[in-house]
Amino acid sequence: MNSSRRTLILRLWVASLCLLTSVAHAQDVAEIPDAVRENVELLVHKGLEDTVGYAFVRDLTTEVGPRLAGSEAEARARSWSTQKLAELGFANIRTEPFTIPYWSRRVDRGSIVSPAPQNMVITALGGSTSTPPGGVEAEVIRFESMRELRAASSDIVAGKIVFIDEKMTRTQDGSGYGMAVRKRRNCATTTSEKDGVACLIRSVGTQDRRFAHTGMMSRSAAVGDGPAAAVSPPDAEQLTRLLENGPVRIRLDIQVEAQSEAPSGNVIAEVVGRERPEEVVLLGCHLDSWDLGTGAVDDGAGCGIVVGAAHLILSLDEAPRRTIRIVLYGAEEVGVLGGHAYAKRHADEMDHHILAAESDFGADKIYRFDTRFGEGALPYARAIQQMLEPLGIAPGHNLAGGGPDISMLPEL
């Protein structure tokens, strides 16, 4: 079975079954009315053949491409999405604008100067400041972790380029990513505090290709506390080998553009509920991406999943009891700013948000079903789990975190 379609089906089941209103005890498995079961089975059957979700991400990445937060391309993505959602028949389509600090890379180059001159594949991290024009050259000091850097004295860091060579642990559920990004967020600040001149981190990820993975560092404005970049895994290995033989000098040239304010926005569309239209089941993804690729996986695939799932529900003969609201969040990559903006704008409506789900972790085989349901809703979690078993999806825990943007919502 196509993995993106498995993800689509999971979203459909959650969105469909969460519309139930009967009561059951926490240790029971909820009884699902026959009509709802039939709808679920129909949605699964359609979902296995449906191509709306795939077409959405294919066309988004082809016709718009990379969608850096605050850029003209992100604005085009909002216009493109509203048109697509209208063509698909959704209701109440609108954009909710907000402003963000804007950052973009202009130059990011790195090289080993001595003892073995050669280029390195690097990429500036989001929020990095610029180096002096032409770059900065200094001796490298290597640390195996952020903890090691924090424990180091300023005397050994001052005037040097810090290299954090911490590797990401490969895990099935991706939990190693959260640990790995700490160096990306904090390296520049800690380096600056210890009078280092720049920070270089081993690229976050478990692949070994000569490609550097970007992402956001901590900041309170358009830029952070110093120049910072990621280096590809093969170049990190090369740098480590050279350091084993003696001192190494490198050059980093990073030039960025930053503005205090730029436009962004959340795109919203709905399948209006037939009985309780004021009550909302939110399905979210983020529309922005970084600029080094097309944003197909992060998070074009997530937007394809939620749009495809909601469209299948829209195609049913009868509307759902509650409103299904799609939110294509803006500016997630640069600080979950769309999530903050939505939570602030809709603060008075949170009592009407019944459930939220987000797709922002790629599209691959679904192997486990985790939830975060209240005690009274746990029987429905168990019912959903039972219905997912034929797809090879195992029961999980009730401690799910949802996703970055919906994590900004108050407890539902």
Annotated model-derived regions:
Residues 11-22:
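Bacterial N-terminal signal peptides
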Residues 29-30, 36-39, 58, 62-173:
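Noncatalytic luminal/extracellular "stalk/propeptide" segments of secretory-pathway proteins
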Residues 31-71, 209-219, 288, 355, ...:
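N-terminal capping segment at the start of a domain
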Residues 36-39, 113-115, 121-154, 217-296, ...:
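Soluble metallo-hydrolase cores and metallopeptidase-like ectodomains found primarily
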Residues 40-48, 62-73, 138-143, 172-188, ...:
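Second-shell loop/turn segments in exported
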Residues 55, 63, 312-337, 356:
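Short helix-loop-beta-strand segments that form the rim/entrance of peptidase-like active sites
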Residues 117-119, 133, 138, 228, ...:
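Metal-dependent peptidase/peptidase-like ectodomains
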Residues 150-206:
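A conserved hydrophobic secondary-structure block that centers on an alpha-helix together
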